[in-house]
Amino acid sequence: PFAGVTSYLGTTGADPIEEIKTCIRAADQVSEEDPEGAQLLGVHLEGPFINPVYKGMQKEECCLLPDVTVMEDLYNTFKNKKLCRHMTIAPERPGADAVLRFCQEHQIQTAVGHSAATFEEIKKMRAYGLGGFTHTFSGMKGFHHRELGTAGAALYFDDMICEFAKQTGMTVSHEAFELAYRIKGSSRIVLTTDCCGLAQTQSCFDHYVRKIRFVKDGDQVCLEHYDGKKEWIDPRDYQAVKQVEMSYAQSVNN
């Protein structure tokens, strides 16, 4: 493709259960129709079993305690069960162990996100198949030298993948990302994108939520922050980006 991605996981949020089911049915329909363009590999359930303390932009009233009955209901909504590929969960919340066991038994990948989990809680729950971290450092308990927290666990466990969303330096500083990259390496870091705005546009794009303007500047992209700060991104050195992109494709296809 000229822009965007070759494949993706359709992602739900912490929404009312019926809205999540509507998204699942839509994913089934897209999978059956197999339209031209990027391939739908499956669905990522980013909630509803997340911690409201770290809800981020999710709906607090829809952040539910992990409930295996609700999980079974969501899973059974899928006509094509193979589309239920990935779930983000707060493993410290009561009931998470049963949901994680269910996911493990049904080959559903799980990741820590929107979570206040301690290092020890994640260490314990790894036995239930936790494989990574969703938008690492954002929406999770931070690092302390006496209690590593969720962020520290993300760096510590070599076999767990750290996903970073839209790494522009806005939600995670460049230095924090570089620190993670030094520790984890390209094979254990993945980048995801919502690919909005700038793709194939000939003019600037205003991201009103992030308060930033994306402007094409020759072969580069200029990020003009509303506070006056400017940054330039040179996409020509694609090899380093390709390494982390492919690690994501491989992770969801395993």
Regions picked out by a protein language model, each given a short descriptive name:
Residues 2, 31-35, 75-81, 126-128:
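Acidic (Asp/Glu)-rich catalytic clusters
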Residues 28-31, 100-107, 181:
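Surface-exposed amphipathic alpha-helices with a cationic face
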Residues 51-76:
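Conserved phosphate-binding/catalytic loop of the ribokinase/pfkB sugar-kinase fold
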Residues 72-75, 93-102:
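N-terminal active-site wall of soluble small-molecule enzyme domains
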Residues 90-95, 114-118, 168-171:
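Short beta->alpha connector loops
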Residues 121-253:
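Active-site-adjacent C-terminal substructures of enzyme catalytic domains
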